[in-house]
Amino acid sequence: MGDALSDADLQLALYCCYELHYRGLAGVNPDWKWDRALLSFRGEIEHAFLDRLRDETGPFACHSLGDIGSALGELIASASGPSLSNFLLESGSLSQIQEFCVHRSAYQRKVADRHTIAVPSLSGDAEVAMAEIQFDDYGRSSAVGRRSTLFADTMTALGLDSAYGAYLDELPGPTLATVNLVSMFGLHRRWRAALVGHLATFEMSSIAPVERYSRALAHLGTGRGGNRFDDVQVAGNPGDGAIARDRLVAAAVETEPHLRDDLLFGAAAVLLVEERFARHLLDAWSVGRSSLVPPGLDLCAALGRHNLDGLDPSPSGFGRGASGPENRS
């Protein structure tokens, strides 16, 4: 097994295990969602993933004093990774912005769904605040305004395939890790506070980079359909960021103070995987190559290399070429 934070086979296998909890996989029996052998296999990958996240994020003693909103802000301010949005605004080419959107499609085409899974795990004002933030992501009762739909419009404006999961086979480990992280937190009640930290970090830190992405798209002349996703994000995120900081994290820790470090772990984990994601893209582009996976990686091979005992993936449509609207994300 390679580095659990970036191993493409490992992250692809984990992604497909999680997809059974969302739209499913074409040709795969929905009952596999709770198959004991599959859950055991998934658990082994999750443990490896969590171990690496803990190794890289370390303890949170330096952020243990003061109110949780300030501690979270301090943690976000300490992030030192490269700025992908600055690069794309200042010197990004059309092909690089297209690649960036391909990478982000796995996250943005089902944005909010993974956080929403955990709403019942919260209580009181934390639950209400989480639902309020999610309401924005779902378009405030208008399917046209759903963030996932707006991102699909951006992909279409860039000449990309906006179908759900159209580019799964091309996504490298660091990209899939950004998606799997929130699924892992959301599907385990034990990590509910980490999920709160994950969401709050996104809401509190995304306005400036999203604004730069919007300007980069505008420079390419994609039109309103191309950057409306980012424009809506910029307009809505100040309010959602305030809700996340002042109500969501505060209420979560007030209700369950023993989960404070878990909340900070979730924040540190998302900052880590986002930094590694940005470095992956920028490192590839700096030497003139694509940041996407070359053809040839498939899930059947990934499952085989990770010893999934008790299951035969081949007849169930796991590999490349599985067709239908629910095969990938």
Task: Go through each PLM region and give its residues.
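Non-heme di-metal
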Residues: 1-329
